[in-house]
């Protein structure tokens, strides 16, 4: 199995549940080049890992991180954030 195969190429941003348990979950996210996961918040701390591609994570506190394959960023709860696909990107969000 491959994370990339979970997503359709036609959606600019795609989020598919990868794993769920009573204690947390993982979501596979694909962002196509030039597209953006729009501004939103999370109620729980999260970890965003870049599997493939290049994306930029930003939040309302001025944090800006370029994510390449293997890079990750922690996401604070109740802080607006967004992610832009500089290249087609495969990411995993763990909460």
Question: For each predicted feature, which ranges?
Answer:
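A generic "binding-loop/recognition-motif" signal
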Residues: 24, 33, 43, 63, ...
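Conserved short histidine dyad/triad with adjacent acidic residue
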Residues: 12, 25-42
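Glycine- and acidic-residue-biased ligand/ion/polar-headgroup-sensing regions
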Residues: 44-56
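Short acidic-glycine-tyrosine-enriched beta hairpin
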Residues: 61-78
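A short hydrophobic beta-strand segment most commonly corresponding to one strand
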Residues: 88-95
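Short beta-strand His + acidic residue motifs that chelate non-heme Fe in jelly-roll/DSBH
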Residues: 37-39, 57-58, 75, 80-86
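A short, N-terminal "cap"/entry segment at the start of jelly-roll beta-barrel domains
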Residues: 1-23, 27
């Amino acid at each position: 199995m491959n994370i990339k195969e979970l997503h359709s190429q036609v959606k600019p941003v795609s989020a598919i549940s990868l794993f769920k348990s009573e204690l947390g979950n993982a979501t596979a996210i694909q962002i196509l080049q030039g597209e953006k996961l729009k501004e939103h918040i999370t109620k729980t701390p999260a970890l965003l890992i870049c599997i493939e591609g290049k994306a930029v994570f930003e939040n309302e506190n001025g944090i800006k991180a370029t994510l390449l394959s293997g890079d990750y960023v922690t996401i604070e709860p109740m802080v607006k954030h967004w992610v832009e696909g500089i290249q087609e990107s495969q990411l995993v969000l763990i909460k």
